[in-house]
């Protein structure tokens, strides 16, 4: 009985082997036709003058020109000048002013983690772009003001 079932299985396998390539061929042709149709739909039929005259080199040149104009505009109008130099001294008069705004103060803050100066407040003075105008309490009382005129 096992021999008969093996023969039947082998006959069925042979039969399916013959019909299977034909089905594969039909499926493959249908898929190719679908792909060709989709590609035709995606192709430009009338791209217009902007796409037809497209040149990547001139586009890149125009982009560079626009970027340089934009950078020039922003660099001159909105450039914030530094108030302190690299060692933490005021650039306008080379004064070594403490952030407490007292002229004769030798430094009343903890040492700065960046420059080790006792004259830096919560933020290091080296290359800083702003100055303290005044020291004011929560009640609004002014304790000290900037002793120098610092230009913008």
UniProtKB/Swiss-Prot annotation:
Region listing for Disordered, in residue ranges: 1-21
Pfam families: ARF7EP_C
Domain of life: Eukaryota
The protein's name in its UniProt record: ARL14 effector protein-like
Organism per entry: Homo sapiens (Human)
Lineage: Eukaryota, Metazoa, Chordata, Craniata, Vertebrata
């Amino acid at each position: 009985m096992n021999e008969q079932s093996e023969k039947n299985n082998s006959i069925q396998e042979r039969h399916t082997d013959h019909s299977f390539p034909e089905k594969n061929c039909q499926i493959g042709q249908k898929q190719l036709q679908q792909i060709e149709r989709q590609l035709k739909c995606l192709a430009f039929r009338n791209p217009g003058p902007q796409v037809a005259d497209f040149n990547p080199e001139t586009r890149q040149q125009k982009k560079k020109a626009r970027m340089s104009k934009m950078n020039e505009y922003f660099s001159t109008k909105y450039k914030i000048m530094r108030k302190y130099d690299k060692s933490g001294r005021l650039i306008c008069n080379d004064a070594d002013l403490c952030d407490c705004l007292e002229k004769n103060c030798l430094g009343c803050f903890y040492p700065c983690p960046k420059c080790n100066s006792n004259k830096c407040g919560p933020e290091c003075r080296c290359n800083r772009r702003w100055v303290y105008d005044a020291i004011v309490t929560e009640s609004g009382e002014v304790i000290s003001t900037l002793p120098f005129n610092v230009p913008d």
